[in-house]
């Protein structure tokens, strides 16, 4: 279904580390060695971009069906996010066994150390997956896709890969600075260092917890308070996991029946069906369970009814404010007036985040009232001229999620248009799996799928099986390619918007509404109808594929 060609010669890569890497190509070029065994002049049935959960799931699924399949990975190893995200304190926010492959040959020979694995343990897990099913033999590492086009005559994609030379310039700042998504593998010693964390999303929270106890001083630059939830991490014994694995097949089936792909689901009643005392008990139980229980296992109207949502926020506020000593900080970190509806931004999980601000060495800088202006040689300068001198900066401001993954690949449609320009006014997909004008191209955990409103491995399994079945149907029916119809894509977009409009998500800027990237369309990017409904709808579309796709037969196979 595709081939790989070399682009024009690029500058010779160097192994010199980047001072401040901000893209996949920056990180990839910082790793030397070869571009992998499959990088050049390749003709395969399927090319997969990325060697994380989704890529590995697709590799095994398609290989099991006899298809020649390889992965192009920008990094230097498998693991996807967990090869990039190695900042201090990085850990997953889904619990074991929700966050793992459902293949018996993998889980029966693996035991976790805790119920919320760190990035180090997740790297070990992906190495284990490779040993069991053989991933790396079909991977080209340090290989960045920068362009791809489809030939309607041959029914194949041609993809281009290249190296990018190191960042040519350095800014004025003389200290150490790294983005959380491109953290160096080597540890940064922050003892006796003045440190700063810019951003209070998941990575900002985790870095703050890691640096707070050891840095000489730490300043956390906050625009919006993080409505974080308790993680409740605990060790897992081998004996406990051996007992649990008897139920894994049932648990893996169940996670696909819950709204968000976790091993728990909404209560079958609304907030005000209960008395105030009963609500308190429900909230308390979910809070003590930890993880996302307080987000997606309380009342079913919590993300839909403003008054119901205020009740959950009041409980959250009471719990968190009791942990913060300073009254002024208490109001900044857990304000009585909610900054936005609870849960319309994906909550982060924390262990002792709020307690860090009880330390004399940890402070909060409000950059909503006084934004960052620029960096100086010594540190961070705010709009009013205040300069914060720091030795180490962690930039935890997030990245262009969901749609950015697709638009950075240099994809060209059969009409000759670039996906990046097509999606500038807003993303257009069919089923959250395909894009009109890009035949035989499928995406997982991206725009208009459950994605950020779901547990990653669960969504990957639902979408990955669909893609494998779609490709099998193409092969079995003598089809050259399928191309989503524009009217079907428009109908799917309308469906995504209508579902989202029933929720509280449109009330604030968040990753669910396109993120905070300047100039990016403000629109829903995730399917908010729940994983079971989504799975049913995409299956019906595959059964009746000629309603949503132009199905082009291969004359040579008829």
Predicted regions and their residues:
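N-terminal FAD-binding dinucleotide-binding subdomain shared by FAD-dependent oxidases/monooxygenases
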Residues: 2-46, 51-54, 61-170, 186, ...
């Amino acid at each position: 279904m595709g081939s790989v060609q070399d682009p024009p010669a690029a500058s010779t890569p160097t192994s010199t580390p980047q001072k401040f890497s901000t893209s996949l190509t920056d990180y990839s070029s910082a790793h030397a060695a070869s571009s992998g065994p499959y990088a050049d002049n390749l003709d395969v049935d399927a090319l997969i971009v990325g060697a994380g959960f989704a890529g590995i799931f697709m590799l095994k699924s398609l290989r099991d069906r006899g298809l020649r399949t390889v992965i192009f990975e920008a990094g230097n190893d498998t693991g996807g996010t967990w090869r990039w995200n190695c900042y201090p304190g990085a850990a997953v926010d889904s619990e074991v066994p929700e966050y793992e492959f459902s293949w018996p040959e993998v889980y029966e020979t693996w035991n976790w150390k805790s119920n919320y694995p760190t990035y180090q343990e997740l790297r070990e897990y992906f190495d284990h997956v490779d040993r069991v099913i053989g991933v790396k033999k079909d991977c080209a590492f340090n290989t960045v896709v920068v362009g791809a086009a489809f030939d309607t005559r041959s029914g194949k994609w041609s993809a281009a890969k290249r190296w990018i030379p190191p960042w040519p310039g350095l800014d004025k700042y003389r200290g150490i600075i790294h983005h959380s998504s491109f953290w160096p593998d080597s540890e940064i010693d922050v003892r006796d260092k003045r440190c700063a964390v810019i951003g209070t999303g998941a990575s900002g929270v985790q870095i703050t917890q890691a640096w707070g106890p050891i840095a000489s001083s730490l300043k956390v630059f906050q625009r919006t308070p993080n409505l974080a939830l308790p993680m409740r991490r605990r060790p897992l014994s081998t004996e406990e996991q051996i007992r649990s694995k008897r139920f894994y097949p049932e648990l893996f089936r169940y996670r696909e029946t819950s709204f968000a792909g976790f091993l728990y689901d909404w209560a079958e009643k609304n907030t005000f069906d209960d008395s105030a005392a009963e609500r308190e008990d429900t909230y308390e139980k979910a809070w003590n369970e930890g993880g996302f229980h307080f987000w997606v296992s309380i009342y079913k109207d919590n993300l839909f009814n403003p008054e119901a949502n205020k009740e959950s926020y009041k409980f959250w506020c009471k719990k968190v404010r009791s942990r913060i000593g300073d009254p002024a900080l208490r109001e900044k970190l857990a304000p009585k007036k909610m900054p936005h509806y609870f849960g319309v931004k994906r909550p982060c999980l924390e262990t002792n985040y709020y307690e860090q601000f009880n330390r004399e060495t940890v402070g909060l800088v409000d950059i909503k009232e006084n934004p960052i202006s620029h960096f100086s040689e010594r540190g961070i300068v705010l709009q009013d001229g205040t300069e914060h001198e720091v030795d180490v900066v962690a930039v935890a401001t997030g990245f262009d999620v969901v749609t950015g993954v697709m638009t950075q690949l240099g994809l060209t449609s059969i009409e000759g248009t670039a996906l990046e320009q097509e999606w500038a006014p807003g993303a257009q997909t069919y089923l959250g799996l395909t894009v009109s004008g890009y035949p035989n191209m499928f995406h997982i955990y991206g725009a208009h799928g459950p994605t950020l409103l779901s547990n990653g491995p669960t969504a990957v399994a639902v979408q990955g099986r669909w893609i494998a079945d779609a490709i099998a149907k193409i092969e079995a029916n003598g089809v050259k390619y399928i191309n989503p119809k524009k009217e079907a894509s428009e109908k799917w977009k309308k469906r995504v918007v209508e579902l989202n409009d029933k929720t509280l998500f449109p009330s604030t800027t968040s990753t669910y509404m396109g993120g905070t990237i300047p100039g990016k369309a403000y629109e829903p990017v995730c399917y908010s109808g729940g994983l079971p409904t989504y799975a049913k709808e995409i299956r019906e579309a595959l059964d009746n594929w000629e309603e949503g796709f132009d199905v082009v037969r291969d004359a040579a196979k008829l």
